[in-house]
Structure formats: structure tokens, C-alpha cells
């Protein structure tokens, strides 16, 4: 049994949850999947709509090669099979924000097949989520129901935008794992440059499949692949934050358990998560489910990829998070945790690597992942927009390394750097923060201190832990600039502490 | 002789020889159209635009910039979107639709100097074989049986195109063919029509019926005229993913070319029950003519032919049911109000589509539905594959195939309109080429006992319109078909 499975206590015994996700990622592309219309956030309603997007009579789709390249790149990044032949199908249903009356999608021949994503839990352990498939499809427009009490407005700017639907197998067992998976997937997509990962704008959103079962059932499912061992699943549509994903799952699992414990049965259905109430509610049942009447889109030829083209894409793949993490650990001797924090986005890792050149890498990693990251997060910005260039962090660490300043002083210097007072060396110079390494000056301070406190100097011989008081006093007397190592060493000698 | 009696080729030659101007030629056609309104071939006349285009054409010619169709007035089937000119597909749902774009095919005609006379009637959304499903009423065939005044169908769906060409209301017309909609009307009106290889003509800007079957093509007075028009209409269009990126030859150079040594296949499966003896005889005449011209006649078998019509009437409605989903009253076209969204959809589509269109949407929706998809749609796709293989096999034995175009001559308006199956049977000889994507041409080859025209069909290999035109040219020459509908309108 997976020790990470969370047992949910019920009245009738223990339960576990089984989770699978369908993540919709908007393809980073300047134009739409089948029309030349621009893609962009913030344009006025219906300003980015071509004749094709509006489904005018006689208009035809033409596949955007760049979007295909992005999907292939993503597939390679998910260590998945690239299907050299795939097909586009029509998914038929009526809705005002779907101008064609069908969505062009890929039904039984997706462009990308099975793959795997390695995901880190918060405690640093990892688990694999198997990818079932990735397919390309068009997004719909937006229906605006809140503009007029008697009318719905439709904005077709998003209609026809390319989406990648990435379907996982039911390999997640806790809501934390589900969120961690989406985080990791997002990191990979952003590394690849195939999706901007902006969840607030809805450019990355998840449909979450939740079911519950008794302990042991999941293992039977994994051994046989037979879904009969699992409970009936409900699909929660369009959840667009990590927090909501977790909340929705927790609520939904509880809801299903209560139904089952009351002797009822879970209906397979599509549900919506209401973030204000923290609840899921029924959207449509299996009986009400649409018959989408999928069939091959006769306006488009089967998509056939040249293996050489796929290979050329593979050759241009950037270093992906897992590889980068392993390299940071081996090349710089970083801890798994620090490496994990640094690889969350590629810019962060790049910043670190630039700053670490010729410096104590672990020390640089500490400064980058602690002080600087905290400041940037508080300022709501990221490493690409850091007001402090990597050369400043490198210089700060150099000053520590060569003994010019102590780590403690460095923190003070850092505050001044962040306040925009200049480069670290200038600040140290200007503010007179250079460490006192002069033994004579420190010795004098120690001698004065012992002379003024003979009883304490006597007591410390039996109680060496009281040495700290002396250190503090010496530092105080030197304005914090005394080299702490030297202070310690001299104190021990003069006080006779081993 | 009136200017409207000229063939397209003769008219272009006359324009080139400065015997008359495009404005004169166009005006003669406008007058003929006005005098023939009883035929209901044009549902929209654009005389001002025509004269304007003709004047510009004359100006170009004066500058020595004449295109291959310079100054030739043509009619346009109202399935082709025309920029700023109402395009209805002869439906109520698009009754007032004015496109802001021009179909690729028509834009190529205008590029080559042609002049637009107006928009031609058709079966609603090209669904029909008699032009009777048009929201604007049926077209009347200019031909009548000898001694009869009974109104006959010009066939469909390109009934307006065929009637306009037959009645000299244009020098040629655009048409489309999904299951025979160019060739059957051509056969019923004594005109020439060709559906080229699927992908020859761009479908961009043509209101879609069944995307995998729809092809544009011309209806014309002679084989040479058809070749002239098809040359201009064809060509790769990056806006249509199914358009073929293959050079287009000048098809006219193949008309009149010797057919000596060509092998002509005669498929035994096209000898259907109850086929009129006159059609069988015409077929034999065609065989004899080609033999005389030096062709070798080969008996061939296309064993899956009998499944073609049922397969067609599954695939075409399936695609149509999806293609016509966009007519929902939301963005353009007819909108009928309702208490909620579903009612708006229901009211709009109930009111906007005619019965035949609704029938096909329902059939198409049914065959794609869960539980029926495999038995109908998927099976039909398999049949389609078998039919294409039949032709692949045939091409190992012959260079072109000769068949009748339609199982009867033009029938009376109203005669089949309550019997969809009888109506669908009109397509029995023509649907196979749509299913297999092959070029097919119909040309008039004789008259039946009532003096009504009958057509023969020549089917070619994929992209081998050249041979089709050569064979058609030979049959045309041998048949010496010169009959015209006697003017009564």
C-alpha cells in the first residue's frame, strides 16, 4: 500500500480517494488553431475574431503548424509517445459561444499518446503520474451572463484558440498530490514555452475526476487495469487554482463517502465547483450527457508528421525541470530541497547559475532561495524582473567568502541593496560595515570586558554555554563588525574555555 | 444571330476580334434574363454590377490586358459567396445574408476577366435533384416534351445554372456537385457539366453541404467551354486544407485531341433495372462512337456500385447535419425569437430550413448517434473505401469509363417531390465519383422520343480531367448534338 494514501475515516470504515485530471492548457501561440486570427488577452470583445472563428458560411479551418509543433514539444516534454498520424474530429453540440455548432478536437487518434510525469510531494518524495494522452482542440468563446438581465452576450475572442488537453491516468491519491501534479505539469509547460501557465486568466485549468474506494481496491485496479475495482467517478469541471483543486477534491470525496455510507450510490455526473461556498454541485447527469456525435472532420486531412521534423523539435528541447534539478544537485552540491526550489522556474535556476559562477554555490543558493526569493515574492515579482542583478548576489557572497563581512552583516547589506543603495561593496564601504579582523582591536575589547566582569569570567569556566554572552557583548562593543570566528577563538583562549 | 446564342469560346473570340464589346454582350444577356424570369433561373439579377464589370473589362481589353475569360458574362450558383451580393443557398435561413468575402472559385473567374450577371437558383443548400427544394421556388426547364406545355424540372441541385446555360441566359455558370448536382442537371438540359477531381477547386467560400463530397465545377454549352471555365476555376488554395497543390493544365488543349488507343471501360453494374431503352441505346451509341474514334472498349466491373447510393445518403447527411449546425440564429441569418435558448434554436431552425434539409439533418444526426454510428456511418465509410477500390481496380484495365448520366430524362415538376427515394435514385450513376473523388463529366448525346436531351457521363482517373475532356470532345463531335430548347418563355 502506498503510504502516501490518505485514509478517510468513515462511519462504516476507511475510505481512500482516487483522482485523475484532465488539464486544459492554452497553447502559447500568436494565432488560433485553425484561423489566422490573433490570440491575446485584453482585447475588446469580439476584436480578435476571423470569418472562420465566427463560422461564416463557406469558411474552412486550416491547421496552424506552430500549434502542432507546440503539442509535439509538450508530448516530448511529458516523455510521451508522439503519434505520427493523428486526426481531427468534430464534437457536435449547440451553444452560443460555439459558432460552428461543433468543436474541432481529437477523439480516438490524438497527437500524443502515453507518457509520464514525475511529481514532487511537499516532503520531497516523488511519485509518477502516467499520462494517458494529449490532444489538440479548439477553445470556445465566452458567454457573458451578467451584462444584461434579459440577454447573454457572447465574446468570440477566445473561440478557436488552441488548447492542449492533457489527460492523466487515475494515479493521484490525495488532493495534495493532485495539486502537486498540476504544479509540476505547469512547470514543464512553462519550461517548454508551450503554455504560459497563467491560471488566473484561465490559460491552465483542470477537470478533476474524483472517486472513492475501500483500502486495497486501488491496488487491485492497478494490478488488473479493471475500473470495476474503483468507485463511480464524478468530474468537476474547470477548476483554475491549486487551492480550489484541493478544496473541490476534499469536498467531493466527503460527499461521495456520505452517499455511500447512507447506502446510496454515486451517480456518474459532471459537477461544478463553487469557490464561494466551497462546494461542488451537479451540472448534468450521465443521462443528460450530450451525445457529441464525434466524427472525422471532413474539412481537414489526417495529420501526418515527418519523423525528422519531430526529431528536430526534440533536439531543440530545453533542459527540463527533472534534468535541471539533478544537474544542480550534482554540479553544485545543492540539497534536493534547494534544487527543487530553484527549478520551479527556469529563470530562477538561470539566475542562480549566473550568480554562482566562481562562488560558493551552496551559499549563493541560500541567498537566492531565502532572502531574495522572499523579497521578490513579497513584491509580487519574479527573478526575470529582479531589481538586483545576479552580479550583486555574487558580489555579496564574495564579500562573505573573503571575510570582508559576516553573514550577519551581509543581511544588513542585503537590506540596503534591496533599498536601492547601490552595489554590495559600495554599501559596505559607505556604511563602514567592513568586518574587524584586526586581532588587536578585538583583544582590547575582550580584555575590557573581562576586566569589567571578573565574576562572569570566572563562572564561564564551569559553564561554557555562557560564552554566548561574552560573544554578544564583544559584538556589541564593535558595532557588530568583529569577525565572529576571531571573537570566539580569542574569547576561548582568554577565558580558558575549551 | 443573337449574341446570347454564342458559345463562351465564340464570344471570347468575338470580343478579342473587337466584333462587339463586353458591355454589348452583357447587355444582351441582361435583356435575355429579364425576358426569361418565368424560368426562375436567377434568384438575384445584378445588372448594374454586370455592366460595371463589363465596362471595366472593355477598358482592360483596350489596354491589352485581357484575361482568358475577359468580358464573358457568367451566372453564379447561389451557393458561392459573393462579396457584397446576397448569398442565400436558396434557403430562408440565409434569405438576407450578404457576405463580406468572395469565394475562391468566383474570385478566380473575375481575376480572369469574367462578368457576373447574377445569382442562380438551386435546391436549398444543394439538397435535391429537381430544384424544387429551393426557398425561392423551382426552376423550370427550358426544355419541354414535344407537343407538351408541361413544366419539367431542370434537375438539381444546380438547376438554375443548367437552365440559364440552356436558355442562353449566360455563357456559362458555376455549379457544385455533391452527388451529381452538376451532371444530372446538365443531362436534363442538354448542357455540359463537369465535376472535377475532389480538391481541384477550392471549397473556400462555398456554402458547405457535405465537405468530403462537395466540388465546384462549371456548366457550359460545349465541352470546350467547360474546359475553359474549369481551367480558371481550378487551382490550389491554402485556405482549403483539402485543396490539391497540383498544377492546373490548360484543359482546352485536350478537347479535340485524338482518343485513339484509349481504353474505355463499360461497367456492367450501371445497367440498372427499369432503365429506359432509349438510355441504353444512347449508351450503345456512345460506345460505337468511341470505337469509331479508335478507342478500345473494355467490359469492367465495379461490384460495389449498388451500395453507393445508400452509403452516399449516410455520409452526405452526416456531414450536412454538422455543417449546417452553424445556422443557429446567433450571428447572422434568420433568427426567430423564443422564451429561452433552446426555443430560439428550435424556432429559428424549424422556420429557416425546408423539409428536405430537415430530413437530411435528421438522418445525419441519427447515423452519427451513439449506438448507430458503427452500423451506419462507419459502415458507409467502409463501403466508400470499397467503391474507391473498385475504381482503382478498373484503372488497371481502362483509361476512362463511359456511363449514362441519369436513369431518366427530365421529369415533371412535382412528379417525385413526395417520394424522396425516387428522387434520390436520380443520383445512382453520379454518386460513385463523388464517393471516390473522381472527375466526372456529362455531355448531351441525344434526344429521347419526346425530344428531351439525354446525357452521357465520362469518368476519369484522379486528376486526369485531361483524358475526360479528350473523350468528351470525341463523343461531342460524333454525337453532333446541336438541339436547343425551343424558346417559349
Curated annotation (Swiss-Prot), chain A:
It comes from the Bacteria. Heterotrimer of A, B and C subunits. This is Aspartyl/glutamyl-tRNA(Asn/Gln) amidotransferase subunit B. Belongs to the GatB/GatE family. GatB subfamily. Keywords: ATP-binding, Ligase, Nucleotide-binding, Protein biosynthesis. It is an enzyme of class 6 (ligase). It catalyses: L-glutamyl-tRNA(Gln) + L-glutamine + ATP + H2O = L-glutaminyl-tRNA(Gln) + L-glutamate + ADP + phosphate + H(+); L-aspartyl-tRNA(Asn) + L-glutamine + ATP + H2O = L-asparaginyl-tRNA(Asn) + L-glutamate + ADP + phosphate + 2 H(+). NCBIfam families: gatB (TIGR00133), PRK05477.1-2 (NF004012), PRK05477.1-4 (NF004014), PRK05477.1-5 (NF004015). Transmembrane segments: none annotated. The lineage of its organism: Bacteria, Pseudomonadati, Pseudomonadota, Alphaproteobacteria, Caulobacterales. One of its GO terms (biological process) is translation. SMART domains: GatB_Yqey. The gene is gatB. The keyword Zinc-finger does not apply. It comes from Caulobacter vibrioides (strain ATCC 19089 / CIP 103742 / CB 15) (Caulobacter crescentus). InterPro entries: Asn/Gln-tRNA_amidoTrfase_suB/E (IPR017959), Asn/Gln-tRNA_Trfase_suB/E_cat (IPR006075), Asn/Gln_amidotransferase (IPR018027), Asn/Gln_tRNA_amidoTrase-B-like (IPR003789), GatB (IPR004413), GatB_C_1 (IPR042114), GatB_Yqey_C_2 (IPR023168), Gln-tRNA_amidoTrfase_suB_CS (IPR017958). GO terms for molecular function: asparaginyl-tRNA synthase (glutamine-hydrolyzing) activity; ATP binding; glutaminyl-tRNA synthase (glutamine-hydrolyzing) activity. Allows the formation of correctly charged Asn-tRNA(Asn) or Gln-tRNA(Gln) through the transamidation of misacylated Asp-tRNA(Asn) or Glu-tRNA(Gln) in organisms which lack either or both of asparaginyl-tRNA or glutaminyl-tRNA synthetases. The reaction takes place in the presence of glutamine and ATP through an activated phospho-Asp-tRNA(Asn) or phospho-Glu-tRNA(Gln). Its EC number is 6.3.5.-. The keyword Transferase does not apply.
From Swiss-Prot, chain B:
Heterotrimer of A, B and C subunits. This is Glutamyl-tRNA(Gln) amidotransferase subunit A. The lineage of its organism: Bacteria, Pseudomonadati, Pseudomonadota, Alphaproteobacteria, Caulobacterales. Its EC number is 6.3.5.7. Keywords: ATP-binding, Ligase, Nucleotide-binding, Protein biosynthesis. It catalyses: L-glutamyl-tRNA(Gln) + L-glutamine + ATP + H2O = L-glutaminyl-tRNA(Gln) + L-glutamate + ADP + phosphate + H(+). Allows the formation of correctly charged Gln-tRNA(Gln) through the transamidation of misacylated Glu-tRNA(Gln) in organisms which lack glutaminyl-tRNA synthetase. The reaction takes place in the presence of glutamine and ATP through an activated gamma-phospho-Glu-tRNA(Gln). Pfam families: Amidase (PF01425). It is an enzyme of class 6 (ligase). Gene3D superfamilies: Amidase signature (AS) domain. Belongs to the amidase family. GatA subfamily. PANTHER family: GLUTAMYL-TRNA(GLN) AMIDOTRANSFERASE SUBUNIT A, TRANSAMIDASE. The active site is at residues 77, 157, 181. The keyword Isomerase does not apply. InterPro entries: Amidase, Amidase_CS, Amidase_dom, AS_sf, GatA. HAMAP family: GatA (MF_00120). GO terms for molecular function: ATP binding; glutaminyl-tRNA synthase (glutamine-hydrolyzing) activity. SUPFAM superfamilies: Amidase signature (AS) enzymes. GO terms for cellular component: glutamyl-tRNA(Gln) amidotransferase complex. GO terms for biological process: translation.
Amino acid at each position: 500500500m502506498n503510504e502516501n494514501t490518505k485514509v478517510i475515516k468513515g462511519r462504516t470504515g476507511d475510505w481512500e480517494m482516487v483522482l485523475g485530471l484532465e488539464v486544459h492548457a492554452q497553447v502559447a501561440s500568436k494565432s488560433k488553431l485553425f484561423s489566422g486570427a490573433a490570440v491575446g488577452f485584453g482585447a475588446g470583445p469580439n476584436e480578435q475574431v476571423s470569418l472562420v472563428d465566427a463560422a461564416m458560411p463557406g469558411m474552412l479551418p486550416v491547421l496552424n503548424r506552430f500549434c502542432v509543433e507546440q503539442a509535439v514539444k509538450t508530448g516530448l516534454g511529458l516523455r510521451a509517445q508522439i503519434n505520427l498520424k493523428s486526426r481531427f474530429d468534430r464534437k457536435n453540440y449547440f451553444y452560443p459561444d460555439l459558432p460552428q455548432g461543433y468543436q474541432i478536437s481529437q477523439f480516438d487518434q490524438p497527437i500524443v499518446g502515453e507518457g509520464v510525469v514525475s511529481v514532487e510531494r511537499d516532503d520531497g518524495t516523488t511519485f509518477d503520474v502516467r499520462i494517458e494522452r494529449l490532444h489538440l482542440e479548439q477553445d470556445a468563446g465566452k458567454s457573458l451572463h451578467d451584462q444584461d438581465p434579459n440577454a447573454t452576450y457572447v465574446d468570440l475572442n477566445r473561440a478557436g484558440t488552441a488548447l492542449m488537453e492533457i489527460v492523466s491516468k487515475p494515479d493521484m491519491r490525495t488532493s495534495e498530490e493532485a495539486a502537486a501534479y498540476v504544479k509540476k505539469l505547469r512547470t514543464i509547460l512553462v519550461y517548454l514555452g508551450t503554455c504560459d501557465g497563467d491560471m488566473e486568466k484561465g490559460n491552465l485549468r483542470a477537470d478533476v475526476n474524483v472517486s472513492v474506494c475501500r483500502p486495497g481496491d486501488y491496488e487491485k485496479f492497478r494490478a488488473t487495469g479493471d475500473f470495476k475495482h474503483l468507485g463511480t467517478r464524478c468530474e468537476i469541471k474547470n477548476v483554475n487554482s491549486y487551492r480550489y483543486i484541493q478544496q473541490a477534491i476534499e469536498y467531493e470525496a466527503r460527499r461521495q463517502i456520505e452517499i455511500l455510507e447512507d447506502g446510496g450510490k454515486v451517480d456518474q455526473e459532471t459537477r461544478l465547483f463553487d469557490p464561494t461556498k466551497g462546494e461542488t454541485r451537479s451540472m448534468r447527469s450521465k443521462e443528460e450527457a450530450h451525445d457529441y456525435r464525434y466524427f472525422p472532420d471532413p474539412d481537414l486531412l489526417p495529420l501526418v508528421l515527418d519523423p525528422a521534423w519531430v526529431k528536430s523539435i526534440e533536439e531543440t528541447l530545453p533542459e527540463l525541470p527533472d534534468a535541471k534539478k539533478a544537474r544542480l544537485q550534482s554540479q553544485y552540491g545543492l540539497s534536493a530541497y534547494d534544487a527543487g526550489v530553484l527549478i520551479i522556474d527556469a529563470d530562477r535556476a538561470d539566475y542562480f547559475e549566473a550568480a554562482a559562477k566562481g562562488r560558493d554555490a551552496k551559499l549563493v543558493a541560500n541567498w537566492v532561495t531565502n532572502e531574495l526569493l522572499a523579497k521578490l515574492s513579497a513584491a509580487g515579482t519574479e527573478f526575470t524582473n529582479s531589481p538586483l542583478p545576479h552580479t550583486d548576489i555574487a558580489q555579496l557572497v564574495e564579500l562573505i567568502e573573503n571575510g570582508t563581512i559576516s553573514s550577519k552583516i551581509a543581511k544588513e547589506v542585503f537590506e540596503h541593496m534591496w533599498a536601492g543603495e547601490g552595489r554590495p561593496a559600495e554599501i559596505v564601504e559607505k556604511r563602514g560595515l567592513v568586518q574587524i579582523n584586526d586581532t588587536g582591536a578585538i583583544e582590547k575589547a575582550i580584555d575590557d570586558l573581562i576586566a569589567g566582569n571578573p565574576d562572569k569570567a570566572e563562572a564561564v569556566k564551569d559553564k561554557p554555554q555562557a560564552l554566548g554572552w561574552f560573544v554578544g557583548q564583544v559584538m556589541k562593543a564593535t558595532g557588530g563588525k568583529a569577525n565572529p570566528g576571531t571573537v570566539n577563538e580569542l574569547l576561548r583562549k582568554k577565558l580558558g574555555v575549551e | 444571330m443573337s449574341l446570347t446564342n454564342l458559345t463562351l469560346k465564340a464570344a471570347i473570340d468575338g470580343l478579342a476580334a473587337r466584333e462587339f464589346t463586353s458591355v454589348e454582350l452583357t447587355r444582351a444577356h441582361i435583356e435575355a434574363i429579364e425576358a426569361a424570369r418565368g424560368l426562375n433561373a436567377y434568384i438575384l439579377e445584378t445588372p448594374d454590377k454586370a455592366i460595371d464589370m463589363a465596362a471595366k473589362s472593355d477598358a482592360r481589353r483596350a489596354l491589352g490586358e485581357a484575361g482568358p475569360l475577359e468580358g464573358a458574362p457568367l451566372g453564379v450558383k447561389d451557393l458561392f459567396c459573393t462579396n457584397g451580393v446576397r448569398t442565400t443557398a436558396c434557403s430562408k435561413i440565409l434569405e438576407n445574408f450578404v457576405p463580406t468575402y468572395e469565394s475562391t472559385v468566383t474570385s478566380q473567374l473575375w481575376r480572369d476577366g469574367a462578368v457576373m450577371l447574377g445569382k442562380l437558383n438551386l435546391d436549398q443548400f444543394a439538397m435535391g435533384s429537381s430544384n424544387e427544394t429551393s426557398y425561392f421556388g423551382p426552376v423550370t426547364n427550358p426544355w419541354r416534351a414535344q407537343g407538351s406545355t408541361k413544366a419539367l424540372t431542370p434537375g438539381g441541385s444546380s438547376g438554375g445554372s443548367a437552365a440559364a446555360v440552356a436558355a442562353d441566359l449566360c455563357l456559362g455558370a458555376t455549379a457544385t456537385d455533391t452527388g451529381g448536382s452538376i451532371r444530372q442537371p446538365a443531362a436534363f438540359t442538354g448542357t455540359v457539366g463537369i465535376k472535377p477531381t475532389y480538391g481541384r477547386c477550392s471549397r473556400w467560400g462555398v456554402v458547405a453541404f457535405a465537405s468530403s463530397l462537395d466540388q465546384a465545377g462549371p456548366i457550359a454549352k460545349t465541352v470546350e467551354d467547360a474546359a475553359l471555365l474549369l481551367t480558371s476555376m481550378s487551382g490550389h488554395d491554402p485556405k482549403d486544407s483539402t485543396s490539391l497543390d497540383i498544377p492546373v493544365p490548360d484543359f482546352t488543349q485536350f478537347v479535340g485531341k485524338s482518343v485513339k488507343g484509349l481504353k474505355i471501360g463499360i461497367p456492367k453494374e450501371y445497367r440498372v433495372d427499369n432503365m429506359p431503352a432509349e438510355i441504353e441505346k444512347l449508351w450503345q451509341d456512345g460506345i460505337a462512337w468511341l470505337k469509331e474514334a479508335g478507342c478500345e472498349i473494355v467490359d469492367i466491373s465495379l461490384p460495389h456500385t449498388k451500395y453507393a447510393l445508400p452509403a452516399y445518403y449516410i455520409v452526405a447527411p452526416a456531414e450536412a447535419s454538422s455543417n449546417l449546425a452553424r445556422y443557429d440564429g446567433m450571428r447572422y441569418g434568420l433568427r426567430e425569437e423564443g422564451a429561452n435558448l433552446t426555443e430560439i434554436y428550435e424556432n429559428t431552425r424549424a422556420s429557416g430550413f425546408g423539409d428536405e434539409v430537415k430530413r437530411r439533418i435528421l438522418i445525419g444526426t441519427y447515423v452519427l448517434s451513439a449506438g448507430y454510428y458503427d452500423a451506419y456511418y462507419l459502415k458507409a465509410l467502409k463501403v466508400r473505401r470499397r467503391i474507391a477500390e473498385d475504381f482503382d481496380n478498373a484503372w488497371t484495365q481502362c483509361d476512362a469509363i463511359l456511363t449514362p448520366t441519369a436513369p431518366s430524362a427530365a421529369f415533371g415538376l412535382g412528379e417525385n417531390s413526395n417520394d424522396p427515394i425516387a428522387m434520390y435514385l436520380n443520383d445512382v450513376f453520379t454518386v460513385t465519383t463523388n464517393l471516390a473523388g473522381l472527375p466526372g463529366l456529362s455531355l448531351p448525346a441525344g434526344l429521347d422520343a419526346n425530344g428531351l436531351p439525354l446525357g452521357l457521363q465520362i469518368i476519369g482517373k484522379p486528376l486526369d480531367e485531361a483524358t475526360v475532356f479528350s473523350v468528351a470532345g470525341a463523343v461531342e463531335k460524333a454525337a453532333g448534338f446541336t438541339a436547343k430548347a425551343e424558346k417559349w418563355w
